[in-house]
Amino acid sequence: MELAAWCRWGFLLALLPPGIAGTQVCTGTDMKLRLPASPETHLDMLRHLYQGCQVVQGNLELTYVPANASLSFLQDIQEVQGYMLIAHNQVKRVPLQRLRIVRGTQLFEDKYALAVLDNRDPQDNVAASTPGRTPEGLRELQLRSLTEILKGGVLIRGNPQLCYQDMVLWKDVFRKNNQLAPVDIDTNRSRACPPCAPACKDNHCWGESPEDCQILTGTICTSGCARCKGRLPTDCCHEQCAAGCTGPKHSDCLACLHFNHSGICELHCPALVTYNTDTFESMHNPEGRYTFGASCVTTCPYNYLSTEVGSCTLVCPPNNQEVTAEDGTQRCEKCSKPCARVCYGLGMEHLRGARAITSDNVQEFDGCKKIFGSLAFLPESFDGDPSSGIAPLRPEQLQVFETLEEITGYLYISAWPDSLRDLSVFQNLRIIRGRILHDGAYSLTLQGLGIHSLGLRSLRELGSGLALIHRNAHLCFVHTVPWDQLFRNPHQALLHSGNRPEEDLCVSSGLVCNSLCAHGHCWGPGPTQCVNCSHFLRGQECVEECRVWKGLPREYVSDKRCLPCHPECQPQNSSETCFGSEADQCAACAHYKDSSSCVARCPSGVKPDLSYMPIWKYPDEEGICQPCPINCTHSCVDLDERGCPAEQRASPVTFIIATVVGVLLFLILVVVVGILIKRRRQKIRKYTMRRLLQETELVEPLTPSGAMPNQAQMRILKETELRKVKVLGSGAFGTVYKGIWIPDGENVKIPVAIKVLRENTSPKANKEILDEAYVMAGVGSPYVSRLLGICLTSTVQLVTQLMPYGCLLDHVREHRGRLGSQDLLNWCVQIAKGMSYLEDVRLVHRDLAARNVLVKSPNHVKITDFGLARLLDIDETEYHADGGKVPIKWMALESILRRRFTHQSDVWSYGVTVWELMTFGAKPYDGIPAREIPDLLEKGERLPQPPICTIDVYMIMVKCWMIDSECRPRFRELVSEFSRMARDPQRFVVIQNEDLGPSSPMDSTFYRSLLEDDDMGDLVDAEEYLVPQQGFFSPDPTPGTGSTAHRRHRSSSTRSGGGELTLGLEPSEEGPPRSPLAPSEGAGSDVFDGDLAMGVTKGLQSLSPHDLSPLQRYSEDPTLPLPPETDGYVAPLACSPQPEYVNQSEVQPQPPLTPEGPLPPVRPAGATLERPKTLSPGKNGVVKDVFAFGGAVENPEYLVPREGTASPPHPSPAFSPAFDNLYYWDQNSSEQGPPPSNFEGTPTAENPEYLGLDVPV
């Protein structure tokens, strides 16, 4: 027989309890076209399996049935779970008139749910030539109720007598979603078939009679439903119905598509556990059901395992173990720790492909009590396999199965050693569960063996399947076993044939049951093979009586079993010796009695469990143990005549010796401790001296981050060096003054902006303004505002460079009629360069907008306002804000929704800033509340294209506003793009009536207000003072006026390659002007002035044509190629009233050259900014927003004063809305003062552009 026949799994193996829906369920078979193992009992096997069966949980295989066989036991079958095979039969008809559905969970040849093959007469040719003889073979299918095949096709071949197979409309039988439905029908027949009965309107039938007309339930449906009961639109069946219905409800189905729950078709069985939404608990569902095949059952059938997910299975899932309850039900339970090792048999785990038990795998079963799988012994087991090097299995190796008690699969034996006359190696086997069946039908198969008896004396259960015992010529005792007591359902039976006749040969040979076996039931000869004893059982042997009154050892009787008494029990002659097997259940003690137990001797110095105190007892005259008067605990050597410890009297010599020894040990211990202390002190002193001399140890272990050191310089100013001129603005945390910085010991005046905190400001505000100073001090770019210094008075004062033209937003609004395309694109280039520099030093700005860009000159802008800026550490790529008010309309979508700020979120803000410039200061999303911005952005809406922008410029804005931050351009790419556009500005920005002639100097209201102030003349620009240029100061024409004459000169420098250009705005009185191409020795300043410093002068002289020669380095035709050092910047066409401005090609400054005079220390080029060490991580590892301080004092540079406002030393807070900085609202309201009473702008709390991240948007 093939291996597949021995190792096939039986599909489902048990009978449902009769009370479950009244449906009888039976197992199927899995033999395919193989010959039956016992042709003599084959028909009986089919009858036992399918008698009264309605649902076949497996395959219905009808093969090799003779012509005269009665198959009436098939008439109740209504449903087949697997496939149906009718092959090699000689019967004319198969009575399956009630079969409605074939589910096809298993398929014949992996394709067919119905196969009808070679059902013919073996002598078909002889019958055809013999007059009057009708050939045998299948003539009609008569599957008149079959209306559904869920999966699989139809194969009909080799049936010469079969009719009507081509008259069936198979399309109607197949489910519409049956993707695997091949139809292979052979219509070659040797007889003429009559037509369908006239009652068959559609001429589709299964047989000749009117009852065999095919019932159509699919192709006749008019409304597109899967099944229906008629042709009307109202005749549709429920979607959970299969095979048709009698009405529209899911309780009117003839069969269920998925699961049958008490006669109602459902998609799923009710869950065992439900969720209570009121108590938020998982609760047991009293209506829960287990899934068993296509049915919902309250409990799993016997021999099946219930799982936690509500299914009935044959094998537990991984990390689960089988558990048997007291009532016999079995379930799978999850292991609390790694599951215990189990023994696997054939068909399981590593033995899944093994054919039989061999000498190569038999040792794996040593010591096993339960085998998960099956056992099969074939001729090759004992013959060996020389080709694969497997030796024959020796009889003594079979002793490993003597400990076996349970098999979950089947036991198949077709070969056995001749030296063994029985199967006594399985003498302790109690259960064969049969979850896996041989051929899908047999749990126990014994065939062709030379044994004389079975010897399975402990076998008490065959959980499922049939027992087949045949062709064992010497086997007796087959009929002496009560097989009915071993079976668990009525479909089980014993099939036997070809064994030794019991009535003559077995009896005559004395092979009968022992007289002590009850009812003549036994597994073999002798009193040890009885199924049950007629009298008593001692161990494994039946006896007539127990040794209660006589014999040794004495016994007591419990449930007709003879059990021995305890050895310390005294045998009694006229009464029972004991009442149990314990020492306290004796009638009398053989030696002594301690408490209630009989003992061989009384305890003498015995320590009880978990006790360190010994117990001493002695026996009295009656043999009862009594406690000794002295309970010795140690050195118990002297005992009295009773065995108790004698009283110990201490000797003086012993006391003296013990005292002397104790004193000596104490002295030795003192000496040792003293020596150890001295040596320890010497070692400490030695190690201290070595450390002081060498000092090679580090206090902390090195964890280099790879970051560059931040060598920025912080200038500390004295309050006496600062002179406040007028108030520029006030806010909740302080006041911004226009002032003059006069360094000690120098006759120099420098215009500055001074930010002073209020007197009652909290320490947090002082810390935050120092953090802002840290950020500003670390930047060194011509396009980023620079910090000049701080004054550490009682309230910290921040000193920054004064920008005379105010913020870029006000500038473009005021001069919108005079701005050209070149101005706008140059500003875009400079802002992009400034942001690219901030990205290089890992600084996230978070508040880039036109209002936060200051105008130093009409050709030079700088990024400012670092109140919200954040430095990223060396291992950080993004910043997460904790709260605070932020400019919603300038922010990227991920920053609004997830508080995530990166350099790419600054790119979004840059796009909005460019939009502001191109619309001359229009408000983004004007009229739309800030809270609606996230939804608007998620829906894909963006700012519209400005009228002056070409599609090239607008597409760059759109790229900046991509949802995916990685899809946005980098700042270095934006620099390249806008530099390219700046070379040909009118091609990309179209301004109507743009003046192509020389532009006039653009002044501003703010600029004029600064010039009108007193003491603002004869000032020196801050950057010129901090980084003097060689040749900048002209020689003093007269000694008396030399101290101030040079201050009227202004210059501009740009770094190109390694040199620096300077351009004097006024010719020297003593000689020709310095060549503008001459290198400056002051190059390399950390803060590099790359603009044309307009200065706050009282007048500017026009340049001579000779002085304009540096301007010719730029081509008047922007389409011509430019030198690389121009970096895409195009100078104005006519610059006589203005100084030249040249962009620098790289953001990071070059190393400084050695100046002629002393200079303040500067930070090396390329220094990396670091996060302040005082920052501590907050919740979830996110650094708290220590820069959340936001108010007017955050941005003093671009605050525009109101015209005509007086400047008292401490004026009342009457200021422009710009001074209050409407775009900010501080998080901590307790630290703010009351808002100004005469504030004329929009209150900060109502500003729509800024919204707190701590408020859900």
Swiss-Prot record:
Extent of Pro residues compositional bias: 1149-1163
Glycosylation sites: 68, 188, 260, 532, 573, 631
Catalytic activities: L-tyrosyl-[protein] + ATP = O-phospho-L-tyrosyl-[protein] + ADP + H(+)
GO cellular component: apical plasma membrane; basal plasma membrane; basolateral plasma membrane; cytoplasm; cytoplasmic vesicle; early endosome; endosome membrane; ERBB3:ERBB2 complex
Keyword S-adenosyl-L-methionine: no
Positions of post-translational Phosphothreonine modification: 1168
Protein name: Receptor tyrosine-protein kinase erbB-2
Gene: Erbb2
